[in-house]
Amino acid sequence: MTTAIVEGSVQAVAQASGQSIAESFVMCDVIVIVDTSGSMAQRDSRGEKSRYEVACEDLEAIQKSMPGRVAVISFSDEVEFCPGGIPVYKGGSTDLAKALRFAKMADVSGCRFILISDGEPDKPEEAMSVAKTYTARIDVVYVGPEANPIGRFYLEKLAKASSGTTVTSDRASDLLSTVTKLLGNGDSV
């Protein structure tokens, strides 16, 4: 996937308005936390693309439709803020607890969180503990296989812990419409 700056991303809006990336980030009301671990390379999504590739395509469309409102954070072994809008595929493990601790800084009134993942984190109890500290809801888009009920059930439990909703997106085939539905067509969060 390209490292180009996505239209509508935090970085694009900052450049267009003469603001710093930090100033643009604080205007975001949606934080999308994207799993970039090894399993996201599975090529079982639309057009035989990987879950990661489809997630990136749809993230681009979401940011274009909601300019300056969506910040992207990626995670695998490490966590990274992605001001340009597209996470770099990292492979590796699934350190969701670390990602939730990182994103916690944005847990303020009016902010929404959407977690896009395909399975179980490395430290499920730790991730659940962090999720329970959130005041904002964490909605989950499960993009893994239906044949993995353990991963899906865990993510459902995590969403419920923060009063969030879980949606299964058929192996990332309809991620854009799923996220748009969770956000109420992008009009308000």
Residue ranges and their predicted role:
Residues 87-94, 119-161, 167-169, 177-180:
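VWA/integrin I-like adhesion module and closely mimicked acidic/polar interface patches used
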